[in-house]
From Swiss-Prot:
Belongs to the bacterial ribosomal protein bL9 family. It comes from the Bacteria. GO terms for molecular function: rRNA binding; structural constituent of ribosome. GO terms for cellular component: ribonucleoprotein complex; ribosome. It holds the Pfam family Ribosomal_L9_C. It comes from Shewanella baltica (strain OS155 / ATCC BAA-1091). Keywords: Ribonucleoprotein, Ribosomal protein, RNA-binding, rRNA-binding. This is Large ribosomal subunit protein bL9. Binds to the 23S rRNA.
Length: 150
């Protein structure tokens, strides 16, 4: 299925690119989230008319993401208290949602989908540097300190 991208999509293309994707990916992800439209003559004309507006919107989102990245890197270490054993092994784990909630409580909005934990959830106490992807082009690092609850 050929679609016109309305947003920059990782590993697929940029705004305005006409790409061929599997029908299920288009129907279940790209079209419902407003990230693409079906590539037919009428949609091509509508897209070309709205191109400047969409590019301005993308630039504004990028600027907002850069601003949030600066705020996140300016944060001191975000402290998360969790129950732990004697050796520093946590009972449970600290995951994306916990980190996102702690950063949001510290004053910077962060969604759990923006937190990247490539090695899985944090299962020990200590200091960690966690990458957050705020935009396809903007990444930041937040310092997370996991401490044992008293």
């Amino acid at each position: 299925m050929n679609v016109i991208l309305l947003d920059k999509i990782a590993n697929l293309g940029n705004l305005g690119d006409q790409v061929s994707v599997k029908a299920g990916y288009a129907r279940n992800f790209l079209l419902p989230q407003g990230k693409a439209v079906v590539a037919n003559e009428s949609n091509v004309k509508v897209f070309e008319a709205r191109r400047a507006e969409l590019e301005a919107k993308l630039a504004a989102e990028l600027a907002a993401a850069n601003l949030r990245a600066e705020k996140i890197t300016a944060l001191e270490a975000v402290v998360i208290a969790s129950k732990a054993g004697d050796e520093g092994k946590l009972f449970g784990s600290v995951g994306n949602r916990d980190i996102a909630d702690a950063v949001t409580a510290a004053g910077v909005e962060l969604a759990k989908a923006e937190v990247r934990l490539p090695l899985g959830a944090l299962r020990t106490t200590g200091d960690f540097e966690v990458e957050v992807q705020l935009h396809t082009e903007v990444k930041a690092v937040v310092k997370v300190s996991v401490v044992a609850e008293a």
